[in-house]
């Protein structure tokens, strides 16, 4: 495409882009994803005839642009990964022992595949690589036109005689540590298979030859080989388009156009940095590979040779600026990738593994829509927020000061500590399973409020009035007048009420001898405590009237060891003066 090629030439010449310096280089390749034709080549800057072509000859480590090709693509294809698949971003090692870290030196914990790939976390990428059979990874990558070998005996094994590097796959490939390297044209060709629905088409610049002498025309065509399922291609497109639209685009975002992209960085080792006299953390290669439903674009940015005067810092802004200039010449398109019948979109409940469907009462902020290969989507409904079961065996008996209600209740297994311990022992939660367990317990106790029982009275209109909440399996109900009261006990969280049980009702018949006019008293403590001498503060008493806390306006007296006190502070003083022994308050 002459107009696109002219635009790339303007970018490289400096006519339409201001470069960081005169030495920094770039290689650019743009292909048509539907027929494999090379649309434009940016061979480099300040070139003369015969110079090195940075788009087609420069073999460079691809950094994180390798992750869709070596990790998540094979995972979608062979291991039924979904965009929801969970990975624990935690301290991790390669199989042979060395530690692997993330670019920012931190860990994000449990994240989805969508998040892991979008923000380019290294540890989930390695974990994905480790989960897929290596032979399948080699098959997938070779199918995209990138030559990697399973073993030194493989027919396609090759070795660079100049530096000893080879194309033998290993775990470093998961984050782009390819010793042999790739060119921008290689990457544009590979990513095109995602864009076109799963077909590899070898890139080519010649479509036909016309012989002047004879007038004969020879047409050239290349094979269009199905190299991955359409579900794999769509899932990758969905994630990488999400990355672009949420800020992780490497300069590839074009407003009003459908774009998917992945960035990549290859860092120099600390030893190399020291040897060259450049800052630790310096970068060798910067990449952005982007594509639309029509074009695939690969940009490499860096120096021919790194030395103390020519090196990249950690910032990708200069490369991103080049990519923005390049994308101005890539035709916009509002065409989107149509979801194939082999993929289904499903709303799942967050933090479930395996993925489960939300219940009717799952909070909205705990729901997320993700994409699955058809037939692998979740079908089981999560019980985490499901409606709580009703109390059973609800009884009433007259006692001193009221009518004692008692009941039985079985906590659902999903809320039991032993169940949660087993749940969080799954390998996906990794070495932090204990902290995830404690976090869930804290959430249940603090955010949801802990499970207890709401006590309700049904009024004449049939509506319910909540008069108390207790964590005990009993409650002393004091009627407000004589006659029959309809009391309902519901299992519920103290704060989160959406999934409260339907409620179990009992009729309490009062002869009028016990009337409260709405006043109810409940102890905050109600337990036997062993406390150190002179270091105790009592919880006191709570008084409610028609469900409202009236403790501060109530006249409450406390008695301990035969003495009466009118305030909690006086009670605390008295308790702390007691000799060692057993007392009742």
Describe every region a protein language model picked out.
Residues 2-18, 28-30, 41, 47-58, ...:
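A penicillin-recognizing enzyme superfamily signal
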Residues 98-101, 133-189:
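Mid-domain, small-residue-enriched loop/turn segments at the edges of structured enzyme/sensor domains
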Residues 8, 36, 59-87, 116, ...:
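Active-site SXXK
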Residues 548-585:
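Serine/threonine-rich, repeat-prone extracellular segments and beta-strand-based repeat modules
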Residues 259-518:
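Soluble, non-transmembrane domains of envelope/secretory-pathway proteins that act on or interact
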